[in-house]
């Protein structure tokens, strides 16, 4: 049975909007251990805790038996506009937060998401308004996005191509996410990464994992912890959250903007951006994607690509750990009538920023972050997938006749 638990620790009145920390992390990472630590060591803070659990209650009643009231509400699965099904609990969460804020008895609110939820939709919930015009942002302030990273199992889970369904954990029949998909979302959209179980790994393994996490999210603060013990000041009322900054935090985006991902020579972590202004041969690029990867450990790659056989369409590319996805991103603006372009200046300038007279906005733009990767070898392999001068001479109609093992694309861009 799905449950939505609210554990309220009694306190005094407060005047400002209720500051909120959202706690994410994969199943077994140590979220509940951290939560129990917070409940036992509140430093006189009056804290309200909302726990979203897909199964059983994770909090031992003996640890919250004093000054605690439990309030249950049915959980809802909400289909987001981007097609992802995520347990955002919009209506339920709005009701609970409104009640807690109106009581004025709490200094802080800590929301623990279920282990298979992504933090971004939860953050977006704070901008949602219900039919009465109410919004979480009217009564609460999203302060910190925290993700607990399993120091012992993260790399194993991240590199595996296992689906959540294979672990018996999904949000419904339509949930086709992989564990890698979930982990990268939780890491990239975080202000603070808490590294758990560091007592179970070596110093070298810990430092290597920290370097890898920093390459995936250079903005986040990384805090090692044992048995959930972390100073509350690192996760409560930090003032770290900024939606725009969080959306730009992923390492691949920073590399694409020229803000190089921190490189750690000791662990062989580096990043590269591959760009080109001629289309890819569909057969050669397909073979490149599907051959065994033998160039170090590819941690993360993302971007857009341009196939000759689908020259009007932009392809999307997203890889995290052992999972790779590609598909249709949309139509290149070059092939969209100008009257259908965005009318505002900012969006128009964003299009023209990548415009050339020869190809418009059509281009290859892929970012790779990896460990012990031969960058020159990778760049050479990608260059070999581009059309030759002779193939370029075939023109658009000739490109359409090139062998294309990708098959038809559908409206399902890579995540």
Language model features with spans:
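C-terminal accessory "lid"/substrate-recognition subdomains
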Residues: 56, 154, 160-365, 375, ...
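Generic recognition of cysteine residues
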Residues: 6-8, 84-87, 362, 385
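Short, aromatic/basic amphipathic alpha-helical patches
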Residues: 62-68, 210-213, 380-383
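Hydrophobic side chains in well-ordered alpha-helices
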Residues: 60, 96, 122, 209, ...
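Short, Lys/Arg-enriched N-terminal segments with co-localized hydrophobic residues
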Residues: 3-13
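Nucleotide-state-sensitive switch-loop elements of NTP-binding domains
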Residues: 15-181
